[in-house]
């Protein structure tokens, strides 16, 4: 189980291990939120799910846990979204982005907030993956 960082090689090994895992692309751009969809459609780790800052990692309704520009969704909302993707508690989660671990850090924290320990940030993000 990886619970902080995972290297590119460790993720490649995980992909061929037969173990249950899920990868999340947390790429975002505060100035151009629509770019997250464009970048995700253009290049991503094969099989990755998009974790969009505005749609998945924050909420703007009455269920917000706190205030601010991107308030946290409730635990229930996050769990429902993850469940809709087929994510289960025994799975390893790997999160990455293209922004120097900016939004993937939020996803990592949110999964810990839900009580999920097996979540790790891809060391070096998508840039490291593409360079390998």
Name each model feature, range by range:
Residues 1-132:
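Cytosolic catalytic domains that perform sulfur/thiol-centered chemistry
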């Amino acid at each position: 189980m990886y619970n902080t960082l995972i290297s590119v090689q460790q993720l490649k090994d995980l992909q061929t291990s037969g173990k249950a895992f899920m990868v999340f692309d947390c790429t975002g751009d505060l100035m151009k939120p629509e770019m997250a969809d464009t970048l995700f459609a253009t290049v991503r780790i094969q099989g990755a799910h998009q974790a969009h800052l505005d749609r998945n990692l924050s909420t703007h309704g009455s269920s917000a846990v706190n205030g601010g520009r991107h308030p946290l969704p409730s635990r229930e909302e996050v769990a429902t979204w993850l469940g809709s993707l087929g994510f289960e508690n025994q799975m390893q989660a790997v999160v990455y982005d293209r922004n120097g671990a900016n939004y993937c850090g939020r996803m990592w924290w949110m999964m810990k907030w839900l009580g999920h320990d097996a979540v790790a940030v891809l060391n070096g993000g998508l840039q490291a993956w593409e360079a390998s």
